[in-house]
Amino acid sequence: MDIKNSPSSLNSPSSYNCSQSILPLEHGSIYIPSSYVDSHHEYPAMTFYSPAVMNYSIPSNVTNLEGGPGRQTTSPNVLWPTPGHLSPLVVHRQLSHLYAEPQKSPWCEARSLEHTLPVNRETLKRKVSGNRCASPVTGPGSKRDAHFCAVCSDYASGYHYGVWSCEGCKAFFKRSIQGHNDYICPATNQCTIDKNRRKSCQACRLRKCYEVGMVKCGSRRERCGYRLVRRQRSADEQLHCAGKAKRSGGHAPRVRELLLDALSPEQLVLTLLEAEPPHVLISRPSAPFTEASMMMSLTKLADKELVHMISWAKKIPGFVELSLFDQVRLLESCWMEVLMMGLMWRSIDHPGKLIFAPDLVLDRDEGKCVEGILEIFDMLLATTSRFRELKLQHKEYLCVKAMILLNSSMYPLVTATQDADSSRKLAHLLNAVTDALVWVIAKSGISSQQQSMRLANLLMLLSHVRHASNKGMEHLLNMKCKNVVPVYDLLLEMLNAHVLRGCKSSITGSECSPAEDSKSKEGSQNPQSQ
């Protein structure tokens, strides 16, 4: 595509009236002019695409792909490239031997990987399905219905000191606040605290108790009021679940779709606003910056933001109605893009700076201490500058971020009836969010032609967000491989999913024997049996 010969109308953004606002991959080339990667911090506007897509017209072949002619929607499925990272399963420990052993035949290496690594996506599944109703088959006291300890992820015995916790962590916190708690970590104050290793480091265990919200004032006086609320909430949930169990299987999905259709674009935007995650604070590394200290701060921040991101996704109307497999797959596919989109929004009013957190603001030049991260900083600053040129509004940002999540993985791996129904719900939800974005742009008062141009400009920038996220993922994996920074918990699980996805992508692109090819197809069609 000839970028330099694009019409002049694309070089300057359309005038945008924000006075009517009512609400406060893989490896590829990217076109960034030289003025975007020099030492200056303020970047001019850059033209990305030819005007062929500016009219927002959907090609005729898209209608055929979607199963015949029908009502044309404003969904950006044809403007927005679909990702390649699609993870059918998640591993729960580090894959260090992937980097230590010599390269072998692609399909042989991946086959041995699947047989030797434990298939475990418990962390992500537990967080995604945390507020689902109990199964009618299981009783209220079964483990399937139980809460988990916020400190070590063991089964919780109750609500102690302000959080759900097990008896062991409850007793440990009680001893710590009543006696001496001058514990010292023998390592780097980053020990993993889980069910099996919670006794290995008292200092890190106490630190995590405070991080998850344990407080000294979780006393008997609070317990009575909490029990009343908990008893009422439990009764409401049981009634709600019983009502859902009595409905016929064909009526419930239709009712949920009608509820989503009943939401006006304005109400959907208000819901997205209420779902926004809180700001995460992280201590700024002490000067002078080192590669280890900066990467430690960034990975700790990412791990905390991932927890809030899962809660945010579950508050999007209709997301929890998707199958658990689709929810996990979407989050695995887009988490880095969502984090980077939030970073760009926080940095949009601060040219030349990246606002990772309110207390972690970095200049471009401060990234020189980390090998390879300066290129990612330049890409983030360039794309943020383009959003600034377009005068991105908060309501537009809310819709765009939700679209990143919902459009992150469009090709299902299975063809079961329930999964086909989930894919249909996903497309319906994506169309609803897209219509909300169209409504937000229309409320600005600009002409119809300018509305189409603005919508296309916003959606086309998302491919650059995707490219930056791929570079960021590659860099983080490289840092983990070199043991520059340890990676734990949910961030580790997401990274391992990315590694396994990369192995499967190499299998698809290479020549395999027919027997192995048929086995891989059977495995992809039955992911739950693996």
Curated annotation (Swiss-Prot):
Keywords, ordered alphabetically: Activator, Disease variant, DNA-binding, Lipid-binding, Metal-binding, Nucleus, Phosphoprotein, Receptor, Steroid-binding, Transcription, Transcription regulation, Zinc, Zinc-finger
Family: Belongs to the nuclear hormone receptor family. NR3 subfamily.
One Gene Ontology molecular-function label: nuclear steroid receptor activity
Quaternary structure (record): Binds DNA as a homodimer. Can form a heterodimer with ESR1. Interacts with NCOA1, NCOA3, NCOA5 and NCOA6 coactivators, leading to a strong increase of transcription of target genes. Interacts with UBE1C. Interacts with AKAP13. Interacts with DNTTIP2. Interacts with isoform 4 of TXNRD1. Interacts with CCDC62 in the presence of estradiol/E2; this interaction seems to enhance the transcription of target genes, including cyclin-D1/CCND1 AP-1 promoter. Interacts with DNAAF4. Interacts with PRMT2. Interacts with CCAR2 (via N-terminus) in a ligand-independent manner.
Consequence the record notes for mutating S87D: Abolishes repression by activated ErbB2/ErbB3
GO cellular component: chromatin; intracellular membrane-bounded organelle; mitochondrion; nucleoplasm; nucleus
Classification of source organism: Eukaryota, Metazoa, Chordata, Craniata, Vertebrata
CDD domains from the UniProt entry: NR_DBD_ER, NR_LBD_ER
PANTHER family in the cross-refs: KNIRPS-RELATED PROTEIN-RELATED (PTHR48092)
Region of interest (Modulating), ranges: 1-148
Record note on what altering L426R does: Found in a patient with a 46,XY disorder of sex development; uncertain significance; shows a higher positive regulation of DNA-binding transcription factor activity
DNA-binding region(s), residue ranges: 149-214
Annotated InterPro entries: ER-beta-like_N (IPR021064), ER-beta/gamma (IPR028355), Est_rcpt/est-rel_rcp (IPR024178), NHR-like_dom_sf (IPR035500), Nucl_hrmn_rcpt_lig-bd (IPR000536), Nuclear_hormone_rcpt_NR3 (IPR050200), Nuclear_hrmn_rcpt (IPR001723), Znf_hrmn_rcpt (IPR001628)
Gene expressing this chain: ESR2
Impact reported for S87A: Enhances repression by activated ErbB2/ErbB3
GO BP terms in the entry: cell-cell signaling; cellular response to estradiol stimulus; estrogen receptor signaling pathway; negative regulation of cell growth; negative regulation of transcription by RNA polymerase II; positive regulation of DNA-binding transcription factor activity; positive regulation of DNA-templated transcription; positive regulation of transcription by RNA polymerase II
UniProt name for this protein: Estrogen receptor beta
Pathology linked to this chain's protein: Ovarian dysgenesis 8: An autosomal dominant form of ovarian dysgenesis, a disorder characterized by lack of spontaneous pubertal development, primary amenorrhea, uterine hypoplasia, and hypergonadotropic hypogonadism as a result of streak gonads.
Database matches in SMART domains: HOLI, ZnF_C4
Superkingdom: Eukaryota
PTM info: Phosphorylation at Ser-87 and Ser-105 recruits NCOA1.
UniProt comment concerning the protein's domains: Composed of three domains: a modulating N-terminal domain, a DNA-binding domain and a C-terminal ligand-binding domain.
Function, as annotated: Nuclear hormone receptor. Binds estrogens with an affinity similar to that of ESR1/ER-alpha, and activates expression of reporter genes containing estrogen response elements (ERE) in an estrogen-dependent manner.
Subcellular location: Nucleus
Region described as Disordered: spans on this chain: 507-530
NR C4-type ZnF: 149-169, 185-209
